[in-house]
Amino acid sequence: MRSHDDAAPDSRRGVGGGLTIRLARVHDHLDQQVPKGQWRVLVDRLWPRGIRKDRLELSDWDKDVAPSTALRKEFHSDHLSFEEFRVRYTAELDASGAGEQLLDRARSEDVDEVLLLIAAKDAEHNHGIVLREHLLGR
């Protein structure tokens, strides 16, 4: 999977308060320390399969910002198109306020960059893309 930093020209664009938000696969950050100035957060509801917890250094694991279990299962069973998933997941984020809470925690840590980590294999159709877009709109 390509890094999402390379996928979009605006991928390093910041949000209010100067935070840069990036998206990457968990597997690309195994056995690496969190760099100074970065807040590294796992945004999957489930721990990534096959990854020992001691191999992934995190600043946070935010299960609340992940899609609901029902929505995740419906999307992964191919009952929803990515666009339908995007609409429903965005509605969940709007209703819960979890995205804003994530940004508030990141800002309180006095960091420049938030790295959203996901385990998804599909680089083009995953909740991380929707979450990042949602956060950039805040």
Describe the predicted segments one by one:
Residues 2-138:
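Residues lining hydrophobic/aromatic ligand-binding pockets adjacent to catalytic sites
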